[in-house]
């Protein structure tokens, strides 16, 4: 009987520790995903406003004004932050489609390559055209990675369906409006990353918070069972 009681006590202590570790892990992941996306917004705003974004694209800022190194650093930073935070969101929501992870990988690759390729139309026309294509493939990769996920998430959590649809439309309409009014400028790029960043931060906060609350309930239950014994 003593051995059984001791075994039961060890098991209950283990359950409490596991529940506590789950809570701490989720809190850490919530902190880092939000921090990473804030870095995306901050870095994008900082780089995109080095020159007038109503006139200059990110590419032009990097290639025509001597900010090529900063352009590459921005692309690497943004790629890593979006990739890591999105993968953590996929894991949190049990999104298992490989196309999402593959799309993020390609998006990171194409954004970094886009920044590395020189884009000076007058002097390097071939590289300028290649730069345009890698930009296009970056956008397509991001759409492939995230749009199906948002649709899937809206079906899994119906209360988010309208918000996800409207937020994506907000980003799309804002981007198209920017292109029609300003042409291809930095405002288009700023709008995209601002819109995506704020959407992701919102999702990180509400989804991680819900998981944390569930884990805390499990922790309280495990603690009560331990105290009863």
What label would you give each PLM region?
Residues 2-93:
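N-terminal topogenic module of multi-pass integral membrane proteins
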Residues 21-26, 87-101, 151-163, 211-216:
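Membrane-interface helix-boundary motifs at transmembrane edges
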Residues 30-49, 70-81, 102-118, 137-145, ...:
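Alpha-helical transmembrane segments of multi-pass integral membrane proteins
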Residues 45-52, 83-93, 112-122, 143-153, ...:
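Transmembrane helix-loop junctions and nearby membrane-interface residues
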Residues 63, 123-136, 186-196:
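Non-cytosolic membrane-interface motifs at loop->transmembrane helix junctions
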Residues 107-163:
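Membrane-proximal helix-loop-helix units in multi-pass membrane proteins
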Residues 151-229:
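Terminal transmembrane helical module of multi-pass membrane proteins
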């Amino acid at each position: 009987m003593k051995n059984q009681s001791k075994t039961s006590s060890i098991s209950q202590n283990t359950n409490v520790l596991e529940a506590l570790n789950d809570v701490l892990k989720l809190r850490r992941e919530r902190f880092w995903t939000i921090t990473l996306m804030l870095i995306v917004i901050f870095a994008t705003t900082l780089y995109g406003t080095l020159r007038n974004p109503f006139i200059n694209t990110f590419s032009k800022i990097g290639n025509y004004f001597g900010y090529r190194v900063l352009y590459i650093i921005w692309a690497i930073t943004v790629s890593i932050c979006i990739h890591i935070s999105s993968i953590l969101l996929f894991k949190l929501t049990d999104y298992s489609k490989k196309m999402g992870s593959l799309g993020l990988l390609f998006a990171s690759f194409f954004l970094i390559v886009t920044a590395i390729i020189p884009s000076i139309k007058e002097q390097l026309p071939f590289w300028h055209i290649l730069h345009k294509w890698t930009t296009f493939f970056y956008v397509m990769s991001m759409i492939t990675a995230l749009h199906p996920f948002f649709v899937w998430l809206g079906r899994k959590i119906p209360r988010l369906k309208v918000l996800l649809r409207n937020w994506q439309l907000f980003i799309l309409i804002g981007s198209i409006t920017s292109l029609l009014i300003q042409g291809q400028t930095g405002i288009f790029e700023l709008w995209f990353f601002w819109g995506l960043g704020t959407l992701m931060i919102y999702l990180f906060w509400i989804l991680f918070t819900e998981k944390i609350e569930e884990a805390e309930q499990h922790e309280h239950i495990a603690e009560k069972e331990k105290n009863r014994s």
